[in-house]
């Protein structure tokens, strides 16, 4: 029951700490959700006879209410989706001319043909220098509580605007430069007008973020797991169902649940014992709250078999190693090789299929004599 005690202590800490009201509410809601998940887990486990081996019990059905199938899109209250906006966002996702040296686009680090990331511990910026964190996948990211490992952007729309201006990433000198590049091409001007009808001057940096965000809100990868959640009980094999039971019994569902199988909360890395060689402060660098030191957004496990290396620093190379370490450092459990293999078998069922037509690189407008370079 130590996890419940931890949740209650964390709740008391948040309640007595001076924090912005909206942020405090957000944290308390996360803690409440975590406690509800734990209560669900303990109720299920305590309901079984003490003489019944958990390995003999089909836990699959019992834990399914903690999950949701993927939607067809992730709506936003302040960014209405329309085809013109989505198509523009796709072009902007692949646009390099807004970067310094015209070398980089969103797709440089978040490659759509490799599940929205680049399989590198750290991604190189426009000068070839490596960043300080691994590039997370853009697939299914719109489902998440926030963006970036530390949650510093509240939405995919806001996230899209960050790397473009980051001197270590795409390196654009200013928002004005990006707007100037886009306005220099009549095809982009027409596309912005179609995407944002009624606006007198739609080519803005904020609308750049909204267009990319609209595109990303349909970057979803349904898998056999979704078919299973929708009622097709034959969608998963018996081994995959067994793997999910092991996943649930181990306690992984405490943080990895919902439509994203993660991505809905923050958690401390090294919850029950210090994570080895952890230098990144994580969430506390954003909130300036020492109580959130070493907290990171819980990653989604969708397509996890395709997105190695793992963690914010790409320090874990294989999925098997990642499963073992999560159990040990987050749940105080030592898994057998058989249990690790079983969980990995389930995780493989979370690999989805990107829409090849939707993610295909589009034709971009031609530069003009007025198109600036940085």
Feature-to-residue mapping (PLM):
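Periplasmic c-type cytochrome electron-transfer domains
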Residues: 31, 38, 54-374
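Acidic, Ala/Val/Gly-enriched low-complexity intrinsically disordered segments
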Residues: 5-8, 14-18, 33
